[in-house]
């Protein structure tokens, strides 16, 4: 009996070490993404939510491992995970636009500081011993299930676009491997809170791998540029202040002395412009300043590029 118990402990330790190594690979998988963010000095529309939630999950599991005896291998991997996710989020906050930085800061304050603080306070004050372990265990299970369910949006995107661009096979493979290893670790340690969420993690990982095999050779659906941007999570913003650009007949150009008309508009003949050419129209500073003084609103005229439809028309920029 003692031999079987020793053998079980040995296997549990072995699977725990393997789980640490594989989970480390999963934590490091976004490195190419953040290297690109660092190189381009832009987050390119990437979302910070997965990293905030992963950091929250690591914090909870590390707290659980401190409370439960004999869970040192959970402390090591989740401690490393906290450090890695913190570095990712620091880079995101450094290069993200202001709106994304504000949203990320709010999530960190609300989830990783606010909610985690409440959980720690309640479990420390209102529970003791095994009760505290069970309360924390079920909380960790709930958070882990939400983390494993997060790829559902990616699965939906793959089915809609027929493209596996957003779901690399290597990440899905390591997620499945990690789920199997940690399930066996929890089984050998008789820790249901570790084993249970990894069952769902295994199911979702296998589903992602099956989708990858199904769609890897299929041609992705062709979408418009705006649809592709929206699918990637980017936001399209138009200029807020654009001066009106109108087309008038060439006769108006001939009637206007020195290329100007009485309403204060500048006229540019475009006889030699082909229909497919693009003309950039600029408003000179002198005319802009004169108009701003008359209007009194402080708006600045902007430059706008227009597609010329007919070669016998002229562009008039109202200033």
From Swiss-Prot:
Gene Ontology BP, a term: carbohydrate transport
Keyword Iron-sulfur: no
Principal cellular location given in the protein's record: membrane
Entries under Gene3D superfamilies matching the protein: 1.20.1280.290
Subcellular location: Cell membrane
MtN3/slv domain sequence ranges: 13-99, 135-219
An example Gene Ontology molecular-function term: sugar transmembrane transporter activity
Segments on the Extracellular side according to the record's topology features: 1-10, 72, 128-134, 189-191
A GO cellular component annotation in the UniProt record: membrane
Superkingdom of origin organism: Eukaryota
InterPro entries: SWEET (IPR047664), SWEET_rpt (IPR004316)
Stretches of the chain found on the membrane's Cytoplasmic side: 32-50, 94-106, 156-167, 213-319
Keywords, alphabetical: Cell membrane, Membrane, Repeat, Sugar transport, Transmembrane, Transmembrane helix, Transport
Family: Belongs to the SWEET sugar transporter family.
Protein function: Mediates both low-affinity uptake and efflux of sugar across the plasma membrane.
Subunit structure: Forms homooligomers and/or heterooligomers.
PANTHER family according to UniProt: BIDIRECTIONAL SUGAR TRANSPORTER SWEET15, RAG1-ACTIVATING PROTEIN 1
Name under which the protein is recorded: Bidirectional sugar transporter SWEET15
Protein source organism: Oryza sativa subsp. japonica (Rice)
Lineage: Eukaryota, Viridiplantae, Streptophyta, Embryophyta, Tracheophyta
């Amino acid at each position: 009996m003692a031999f079987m118990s020793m053998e079980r402990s040995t296997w549990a330790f072995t699977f725990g070490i393997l789980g640490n190594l594989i989970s480390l690979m999963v934590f490091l998988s976004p490195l190419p993404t953040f290297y690109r963010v660092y190189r381009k000095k832009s987050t390119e529309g990437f979302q910070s939510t997965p990293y905030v939630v992963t950091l929250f999950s690591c914090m909870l599991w590390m707290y659980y491992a401190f409370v439960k005896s004999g869970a040192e291998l959970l402390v090591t991997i989740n401690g490393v995970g906290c450090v890695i996710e913190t570095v990712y989020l620091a880079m995101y906050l450094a290069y993200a636009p202001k709106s994304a930085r504000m949203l990320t800061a709010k999530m960190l304050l609300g989830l990783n500081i606010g909610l985690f603080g409440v959980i720690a306070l309640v479990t420390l004050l209102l529970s003791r011993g095994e009760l505290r372990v069970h309360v924390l265990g079920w909380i960790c299970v709930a958070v882990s299930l939400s983390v494993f369910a997060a790829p559902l949006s990616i699965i939906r995107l793959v089915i809609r676009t027929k493209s596996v661009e957003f779901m690399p096979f290597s990440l899905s493979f390591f997620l499945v491997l990690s789920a199997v290893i940690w399930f066996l670790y929890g089984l050998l340690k008789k820790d249901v809170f570790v084993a249970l969420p990894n069952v769902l993690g295994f199911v979702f990982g296998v589903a992602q791998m099956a989708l990858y095999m199904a769609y890897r050779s299929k041609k992705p659906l062709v979408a418009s540029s705006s649809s592709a941007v929206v699918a990637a999570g980017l936001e399209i913003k138009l200029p807020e202040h654009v001066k009106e650009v109108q087309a008038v007949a060439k006769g108006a150009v001939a009637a206007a002395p020195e290329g100007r008309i009485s309403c204060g508009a500048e006229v540019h003949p475009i006889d030699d412009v082909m229909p497919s050419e693009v003309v950039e129209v600029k408003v000179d500073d002198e005319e802009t300043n004169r108009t701003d003084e008359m209007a009194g609103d402080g708006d600045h005229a902007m430059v706008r590029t227009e597609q010329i439809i007919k070669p016998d028309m002229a562009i008039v920029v109202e200033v």
